[in-house]
Amino acid sequence: MTDLILKNAELQMKETIDAYVIHLRQIRTGKASGAILDKVMVNYYGSLMPLNQISQITTPEPNLIIIKPYDRNVITEAVGAIHKADLGLNPVSDATLIRIPIAPLTEDVRKNLVKKVHKELEGYKIRIRNIRRDAIDEIKKIENISKDLISDNEDQIQQITDKFIKQLDDLTKEKEKELMTI
């Protein structure tokens, strides 16, 4: 029974790490990356669709994103959606594609992004700790379980928690390094 609780907690923590990785990919670093457009939703014939599902997104140069919509009629909607997403991007469109030049980030913007990443890190650490707390509470609710077994499981959960917190810290350091590199 406790093994199932431990495995479930570990799985939830892994899902939290995966969500953090996705979140970090969407933070602009001064290099062109199609991932920063993942959350852009475009009105496509009456329904909202992710931009990356209705177009091909490429980065032919380190400071340029090219978007080729599969349907040319959606170009103006896509440009509007990119502006509305408030990503600090200035798309330029022509008849068949959208170009987004990526300007280098200033020192102040880089520092603010690092602060934002650290703030987000704390939120994800809290999620991991809440998973730990819930798992410990579940174990304590089990009837006829010895205090030694509870203590052993708490130690195991703490080790798992420490491992995932370290992963979060490592991912953050990597992103911080990427942000501060010009």
Swiss-Prot record:
GO terms for cellular component: cytoplasm. Keywords: Cytoplasm, Protein biosynthesis. The keyword Protein biosynthesis applies. It is found in: Cytoplasm. Its main location: cytoplasm. InterPro entries: Ribosome_recyc_fac, Ribosome_recyc_fac_dom, RRF_sf. Gene3D superfamilies: 3.30.1360.40, Ribosome-recycling factor. SUPFAM superfamilies: Ribosome recycling factor, RRF. One of its GO terms (biological process) is translational termination. GO terms for molecular function: ribosomal large subunit binding. It holds the Pfam family RRF. It comes from the Bacteria. Responsible for the release of ribosomes from messenger RNA at the termination of protein biosynthesis. May increase the efficiency of translation by recycling ribosomes from one round of translation to another. Belongs to the RRF family. This is Ribosome-recycling factor. It comes from Mycoplasma mycoides subsp. mycoides SC (strain CCUG 32753 / NCTC 10114 / PG1).
